Structure formats: structure tokens, C-alpha cells
Amino acid sequence: MKVIFLKDVKGKGKKGEVKNVADGYAHNFLIKQGLAVEANPTNLSALEGQKNKEKKNAVQELEQAKQLKETLEALTVELTAKSGEGGRLFGSITSKQIADKLQKDHQIKVDKRKIELNDAIRALGYTNVPVKLHPEVQATLKVHVTEQA
């Protein structure tokens, strides 16, 4: 019997797959547990519609990420911090501070985990910070740290 998997089933199939399984297994386990539905024309067309919708959403997310990249690369985030001799900071600038400043000054919400700051910023001046907006889109954000008066 052909079934469409609604959830991942270890050793049998992944969500969205159409596979042939034993009739008893399909009726008594997969369909009863809500793990699969029978692969009839109605369910197959519903699956096709769902796959098309997911593709559209993926394309839309990619476009939004590209637009956000252009916006971020045009901006400079201004932060102030106390510093000592030679422009070294007391403490450091973290990705959370950068994300908060973006939200506050420019109303752009970026998750702090997407800001790929290898080491916290510990010196005054300009720093280019990579921001991973999408698996295929990475922006570079300029961060300017000035001395606090």
C-alpha cells in the first residue's frame, strides 16, 4: 500500500515521502498513529500544494534576507564604551549589544546568534562584523566604537 508520511518514521521514511509499505503496517500502525495517510489522488495533490507553498516561502525568505543585507551594509552602528590607554576597552562589545543597538536606533531586529562575532570587540575604532541572515546570505555590518565621555 502506498502511503504519504506525515512525520519522520525511523527506518521507513521521512515527512512528505511517498512509499510503498505492507498493508497491515500501514493500516494498523502508521495511519492509526497519525504518522501517515493513504496516497490517494486527493492527498497527493494536497502534498504537492504544500511543497509548492514551502518553495514559495523559501524564495520569499531569501529575498527578504537579501534586502536586509543591503540595508545592513549601508548602516554603521555607533557604540560608546569606556577605554583606557591605547584605545583598549574596559570590558568588551558583544553581539548582544550590537543587536540591541540595531533594534534601538534603526528598528532592525537581528538575532544576536546571527551576528558572528568570533571574539568580542575590545578596541576603539571601526570593525566589520559578519551577520549570517540566511544560509545563502551573509552581510557585513560596520560597527564604530567611540570613547565614552
Curated annotation (Swiss-Prot):
Binds to the 23S rRNA. GO terms for biological process: translation. It comes from Bacillus pumilus (strain SAFR-032). It comes from the Bacteria. Belongs to the bacterial ribosomal protein bL9 family. This is Large ribosomal subunit protein bL9. One of its GO terms (cellular component) is ribonucleoprotein complex. InterPro entries: Ribosomal_bL9 (IPR000244), Ribosomal_bL9/RNase_H1_N (IPR009027), Ribosomal_bL9_bac/chp (IPR020594), Ribosomal_bL9_C (IPR020069), Ribosomal_bL9_C_sf (IPR036791), Ribosomal_bL9_N (IPR020070), Ribosomal_bL9_N_sf (IPR036935). One of its GO terms (molecular function) is structural constituent of ribosome. NCBIfam families: L9. It holds the Pfam family Ribosomal_L9_C. The gene is rplI. Keywords: Ribonucleoprotein, Ribosomal protein, RNA-binding, rRNA-binding.
